[in-house]
Swiss-Prot record:
The protein's required cofactors: Mg(2+)
Organism: Synechocystis sp. (strain ATCC 27184 / PCC 6803 / Kazusa)
UniProt KW Transcription regulation keyword: no
Protein name: Crossover junction endodeoxyribonuclease RuvC
Subunit structure: Homodimer which binds Holliday junction (HJ) DNA. The HJ becomes 2-fold symmetrical on binding to RuvC with unstacked arms; it has a different conformation from HJ DNA in complex with RuvA. In the full resolvosome a probable DNA-RuvA(4)-RuvB(12)-RuvC(2) complex forms which resolves the HJ.
Positions bound to Mg(2+) 2: E75
Role of this protein: The RuvA-RuvB-RuvC complex processes Holliday junction (HJ) DNA during genetic recombination and DNA repair. Endonuclease that resolves HJ intermediates. Cleaves cruciform DNA by making single-stranded nicks across the HJ at symmetrical positions within the homologous arms, yielding a 5'-phosphate and a 3'-hydroxyl group; requires a central core of homology in the junction. The consensus cleavage sequence is 5'-(A/T)TT(C/G)-3'. Cleavage occurs on the 3'-side of the TT dinucleotide at the point of strand exchange.
Length: 167
C-alpha cells in the first residue's frame, strides 16, 4: 500500500466464550495507526453455551454494523492444558468467523499469540506488558488491562502485515 492510498479499517479480536476483546484501528501499514475504539464483550456464566453463542453473534453483528471494518485479525488460540475451556472458545471462534463472513464476506487473518506479541517486541509479554507497549505506541494516558488490550495489539499486527500460515 503506498502513501496515496486511503487508510484501511481493521477490527482486532481476542476470542473467548466468557470475554471477547475487540479493537478498531484505522491506518496504513508501517505508516500510521489511529485507535478508533475498543472494548470487551462479556457473556454470563449463568447462560448455557448456546445462549452465550447467540449473544456473541448479536454483539459481533453490532460491531460490524457500527464500524464497517475492511479487514479483521483474530488470535488463533493455543490450548495445551485447558481442554475444557478450548471447546467453548473454539465454538465462539466459529460463531465469530461465521458472522464476519456472512455479513462482510471477509476472511479474517488468524494470528498466533506469539506472532502478534513479537510485533510489539516481546513474544512472551504478559497482559500488563502488552498494555504498556500499546499505551506507549498510541500515546494513551490510561488503558484497562483486559482483553481489549490484546485486541488492539492483534489489530495493529494485522494492519502491519503480520501473517501466519493458519486459518
Amino acid at each position: 500500500m503506498d502513501q496515496t492510498e486511503a487508510a484501511q479499517r481493521w477490527l482486532g479480536i481476542d476470542p473467548g466464550l466468557a470475554i471477547i476483546g475487540w479493537a478498531i484501528l484505522d491506518g496504513q501499514p508501517d505508516l500510521s495507526a489511529h485507535l478508533v475504539d475498543y472494548g470487551i464483550i462479556e457473556t454470563s456464566k449463568n447462560l448455557s453455551t448456546p445462549e452465550r453463542l447467540v449473544e456473541i453473534e448479536q454483539d459481533i453483528h453490532v460491531l460490524l454494523e457500527e464500524f464497517s471494518p475492511q479487514a479483521i485479525a483474530m488470535e488463533m488460540p493455543f490450548f495445551s492444558r485447558q481442554i475444557k475451556a478450548a471447546g467453548g472458545v473454539m465454538q465462539a471462534l466459529g460463531v465469530i468467523n461465521l458472522v464476519i463472513y456472512r455479513e462482510k464476506s471477509i476472511q479474517p487473518v488468524f494470528l498466533h499469540q506469539s506472532s502478534w506479541k513479537c510485533h510489539l517486541g516481546n513474544g512472551k509479554a504478559n497482559k500488563a506488558e502488552v498494555a504498556a507497549m500499546v499505551q506507549n505506541f498510541f500515546g494513551l494516558e490510561d488503558l484497562p488491562i483486559d482483553d481489549s488490550v490484546d485486541a488492539i495489539a492483534i489489530a495493529l499486527a494485522g494492519l502491519n502485515g503480520v501473517r501466519n500460515d493458519i486459518g
